Design a protein with these regions (language model features):
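Alpha-helical bundle regulatory/interaction domains
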Residues: 1-42, 49-50, 54, 66-141
Length: 141
């Protein structure tokens, strides 16, 4: 790997860290590209090449991951969780949650999650990481 490629990855990591840290803030591709010191189009291409998904897809996966944790607690409504993780449309949030998780936010919230309550947080995070599913319910790569 060349020094230019390493510098490029460092810039992309800066944008990815921004998404991980500030997922609840309104973030768009131009803002993420600024964090990576790239044009929006170049940033989108480079991010997808490096991480295998679009910047927006990565951001939404982080939001869904956090939403799952909040829904497991059961003390917030789906609407409250939607807004807390940075989504502004309940319909879009529910559709994306269902696409990624394979069930609606309401169904996920209603499920019994006590079995995972004693699992260490580091294991639970990996265990509950959203995995995009196809329309027929199979996990996609």
């Amino acid at each position: 790997m060349t020094s230019g490629e390493l510098a490029n990855l460092a810039h992309l990591r800066r944008a990815r860290d921004l998404m991980d840290r500030d997922y609840a803030r309104p973030l768009d591709v131009p803002a993420m590209a600024r964090a990576a010191l790239m044009s929006p189009a170049h940033f989108s291409r480079q991010f997808r090449a490096a991480y295998g998904e679009t910047p927006y897809g990565y951001l939404m996966t982080r939001r869904i991951e956090r939403a799952k944790a909040l829904l497991r607690r059961g003390d917030r409504s789906v609407t409250e969780v939607c807004l807390e993780v940075g989504c502004t449309s309940l319909g879009s949030f529910s559709a994306r949650f269902t696409e990624v998780v394979g069930e609606s936010p309401s169904a996920y919230r209603a499920r019994d999650h006590r079995a995972g309550a004693t699992v260490p947080a580091c294991v639970a995070k990996a265990w509950t990481r959203p995995e995009r599913t196809s329309r027929n319910g199979e996990a996609t790569g």
